[in-house]
């Protein structure tokens, strides 16, 4: 039941004028996190607009900010807050939180209703706007969402800039002050920012987007950002069209909050805000590592005439079986392609020299299953027909590529894709797509997503630097699974690095490539390099390959252990009783101190792989660790380290 609001606090219109007077005292509509540290507050600006404010430890991380919608081309005018309803925290595995539903209505004109739903978690806060269903025909034609997020000071952020809506969502999370954001640019999610109050860090993103477009951020009117919805492809002036009887819900406008920047990578907030699983029986979904032939250029020693053919694919399958990998990803090139056009690939037929059912049987006999690359448009023409065929072939999963969109139609496509794939017991990896919005909770068969400037950029650029790799751990990696495809073993220095498309190099040490398997979350981890990079013809393992055989792809517990924002990071993840630690550094040589407070009581046997004398070398160390131990670890330029800890 809605309770009548006795009074409504008024928020200053600081986003419009340079100075403002203190708001009059009143009773706000607010909800706190279970630990009491985070509070999200609803109220009205002096202009009458609906607003939110987010506070952490009693101080603003998001200053009073107007939120709203523009349905049918008309923005909401001044509103009255009619009441609110406290929502009991849901059960069923959802993280504990406080929730408040606020009901507002326009004072004049159409007196349209507008709902504002607030949530506060220990890891941050979120809000979403809702238009209630109407008992009449017709559509809601949404022109824009007018929400903004104002900052109380000039934050230092990591941001990816795009020039247009249609893009691969790949780029460098470059350092930028909010005051220096470009007015004409679209900024991708997440926007990760140091607030300037100690080591406190926040990140702005979204979750739970359905029947609604994905959002970008743009420079706000003052310090801060505003939301910019991706328009429908055939109507630049429209963001969404929905039946009035259905109503409308925005995505959750999400703010992650952490006391220290490295703690952000352990956040589950984006996942927790998404809708619960819609797959009733998910026992067939199996995380794991995969061999993969595309990055090296389908070139490997030991295979005459290596290329898009059965002998080459069998070689990768044999390697996966010997190396203990449950999967082999067959990337583009296997399907029949009329006129050689990838977008016209017939993903139900294979090219001459390739026999997918035979390869699937060959792999199954060796304990390996296949993933198949598909073009998003080709597979979208008749999903159930294509996926039923793949199920008969024994395929484990699909890699869907070249979407490049996050408009309302594309968001609905992702939901349809994952639901159809689940009906046919197929796991999914989405490429050329936006960053995660929590869909892996709603559809657990979504194993990983791209939306990252990953290892492939070594094939044609100098962009995948160690500094970029570290910044990913403080930005893109904090919102969900990330298919960076680590494991490049032709390691060299930035000065010696040469761009080449076949058998590419990487400008990090071997140990940094190993650390990515711990630092970057991805329940499907594809080993980028050719089999010959990991094991030579005599069966000898390359330095670090022994670690790759041991590291899992899924985790039971995660801690951001230590770091310096954008410069280096240490992450600990637990699988069963075993802990793995990954450390990554930028181009600077340094010695870092790693605390082991995350360990339980007792003694732990440690094995470590650290930077060796050359980029391709690792040095091994063994020892005994206790809870509370601190280790000093040297990092070479563009370096890293990994550790495995077992109960003694």
Predicted feature residues:
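Bacterial N-terminal signal peptides that target proteins for export
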Residues: 1-10
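C-terminal motif of bacterial Sec signal peptides marking the signal peptidase cleavage site
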Residues: 17-19
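N-terminal accessory beta-strand-rich subdomains and adjacent acidic, glycine-rich linkers
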Residues: 24-277
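Aromatic- and carboxylate-enriched substrate-binding clefts and catalytic-loop regions
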Residues: 332-509
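Carbohydrate-binding surface patches
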Residues: 564-601, 641-644
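An acidic-aromatic substrate-binding cleft motif
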Residues: 245-327
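Glycine-rich, aromatic-lined ligand/substrate-binding cores of catalytic
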Residues: 497-562, 566-575
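C-terminal beta-strand-rich structural cap/linker in extracellular carbohydrate-active enzymes
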Residues: 623-648
């Amino acid at each position: 039941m809605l309770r009548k609001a006795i009074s409504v606090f008024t928020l200053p219109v600081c986003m419009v004028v340079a100075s403002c007077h203190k708001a009059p005292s009143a009773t706000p509509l607010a909800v706190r996190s279970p630990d009491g540290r985070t509070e999200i507050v609803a109220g009205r600006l002096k202009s009458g607009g609906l607003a939110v404010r987010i506070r952490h430890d009693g101080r603003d991380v998001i200053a009073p900010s107007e939120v709203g919608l523009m349905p049918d081309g008309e923005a909401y005018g001044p509103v009255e807050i009619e009441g609110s309803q406290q929502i009991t925290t849901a059960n069923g595995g959802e993280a504990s939180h406080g929730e408040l539903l606020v009901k507002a209505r326009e004072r004049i004109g159409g007196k349209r209703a507008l709902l504002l739903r607030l949530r506060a978690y220990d890891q941050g806060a979120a809000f979403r706007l809702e238009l209630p269903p109407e008992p009449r025909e017709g559509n809601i034609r949404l022109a824009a969402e007018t929400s903004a997020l104002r900052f109380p000071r000039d934050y230092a952020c990591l941001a990816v800039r795009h020039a247009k809506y249609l893009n691969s969502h790949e780029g460098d999370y470059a350092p930028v002050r909010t005051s220096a954001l470009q007015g004409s640019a679209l900024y991708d999610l997440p926007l990760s920012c140091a607030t300037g109050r100690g080591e406190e860090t926040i990140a702005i993103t979204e979750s739970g987007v359905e029947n609604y477009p994905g959002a970008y951020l743009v420079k706000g009117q003052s310090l801060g950002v505003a939301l910019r919805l991706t328009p429908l492809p055939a109507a630049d002036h429209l963001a969404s069209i929905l039946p009035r009887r259905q109503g409308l819900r925005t995505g959750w406008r999400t703010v992650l909050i952490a006391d220290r920047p490295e703690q952000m990578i352990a956040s589950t907030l984006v996942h927790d805000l998404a809708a619960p699983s819609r797959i009733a029986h998910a026992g067939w979904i199996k995380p794991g590592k995969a061999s993969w032939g595309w990055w090296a250029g389908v070139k490997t020693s030991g295979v005459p005439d290596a290329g898009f053919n059965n002998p080459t694919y069998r070689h990768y399958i044999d390697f996966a079986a010997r190396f203990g990998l449950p999967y082999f990803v067959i990337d583009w090139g296997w399907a029949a392609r009329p006129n050689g056009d990838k977008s016209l690939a017939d993903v139900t037929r294979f090219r001459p020299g390739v026999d997918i059912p035979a390869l699937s049987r060959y792999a199954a006999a060796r304990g390996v299953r296949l993933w198949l690359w598909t073009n998003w448009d080709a597979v979208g023409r008749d999903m159930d027909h294509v996926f039923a065929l793949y199920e008969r072939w024994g395929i484990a999963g699909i890699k869907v590529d070249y979407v490049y969109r996050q408009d309302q139609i594309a968001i609905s496509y992702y939901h349809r894709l994952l639901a159809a794939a689940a009906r046919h017991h197929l796991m999914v990896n989405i490429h050329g797509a936006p960053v995660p919005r929590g869909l892996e909770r709603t559809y657990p068969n979504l194993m990983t997503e791209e939306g990252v400037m990953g290892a492939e950029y070594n094939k044609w650029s100098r962009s995948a630097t160690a500094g970029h790799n570290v910044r990913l751990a403080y930005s893109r990696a904090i919102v969900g699974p990330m298919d960076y495809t680590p494991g490049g073993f032709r390691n060299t220095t930035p000065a010696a690095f040469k761009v080449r498309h076949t058998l590419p190099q990487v400008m990090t040490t071997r140990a940094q490539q190993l650390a990515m398997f711990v630092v970057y979350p991805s329940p499907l981890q594809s080993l980028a390099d050719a089999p010959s990079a990991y094991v030579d013809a005599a069966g000898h393992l390359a330095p670090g390959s022994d670690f790759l055989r041991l590291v899992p792809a899924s985790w039971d517990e995660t801690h951001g252990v230590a770091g310096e924002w954008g410069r280096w990071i240490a992450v600990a993840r637990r699988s069963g009783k075993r802990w793995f630690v990954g450390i990554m550094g930028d181009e600077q040589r340094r010695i870092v101190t790693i605390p082991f407070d995350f360990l339980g009581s007792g003694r732990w046997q440690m094995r470590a792989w650290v930077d060796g004398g050359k980029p391709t070398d690792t040095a091994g160390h063994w020892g005994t660790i206790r809870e509370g131990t601190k280790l000093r670890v040297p990092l070479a330029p563009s370096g890293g380290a990994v550790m495995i800890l077992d109960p003694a």
